[in-house]
Amino acid sequence: MSRKKSAKVREVLADPIFNSVVVTKLINTIMLDGKKSIAQDILYSAFDLVKEKTKKDPMQVFTQAVENITPQLEIRTRRIGGTNYQVPTEVSKRRKQALSLRWLVQYARLRNDKSMDLRLANEIIDAANKTGGAIKKREDTHKMAEANKAFAHFRW
């Protein structure tokens, strides 16, 4: 174990339009090479597309999508007696949010739509409707945890 102090968790400021910390975290997840203004443009135009397609408040659709993607369990590899076990563990609140936003952006990038804002909008809508790649990832993670439930007693 490291003897250094653990790094302090910095406060993330809420974004100016939706006044939400989660939206800022999503912008930071979308951002590549430090180009935050481009990431903001992508997200805000994606929210406009969500509003156009669903006729609902994009923030509500987004929070529903994140809620549907959020994992409860995950698999951690633990080495005991020369054998690696896949141990299911509960996910902390911060990691739940980070994973859900990461999966949302990851599977939006893998889509075949024309632009990133369209891909992201479609992935958010799909996640809110409990379909799409990010939901499948969550289900696969939960299935793996369920399959390895026998090793749950190896927890940290």
From Swiss-Prot:
Matching Pfam families: Ribosomal_S7
Coiled-coil ranges per UniProt: none
CDD domains per the UniProt record, alphabetical: uS7_Bacteria
Keyword set includes tRNA-binding: yes
Any single Gene Ontology cellular-component annotation: small ribosomal subunit
MF (Gene Ontology): rRNA binding; structural constituent of ribosome; tRNA binding
Highest taxon of the lineage: Bacteria
GO terms classed as biological process: translation
Alphabetic keyword roster: Ribonucleoprotein, Ribosomal protein, RNA-binding, rRNA-binding, tRNA-binding
Subunit structure: Part of the 30S ribosomal subunit. Contacts proteins S9 and S11.
UniProt cross-references to NCBIfam families, sorted A to Z: rpsG_bact
Similarity field: Belongs to the universal ribosomal protein uS7 family.
Function description: One of the primary rRNA binding proteins, it binds directly to 16S rRNA where it nucleates assembly of the head domain of the 30S subunit. Is located at the subunit interface close to the decoding center, probably blocks exit of the E-site tRNA.
PANTHER family: RIBOSOMAL PROTEIN S7
Name of the protein: Small ribosomal subunit protein uS7
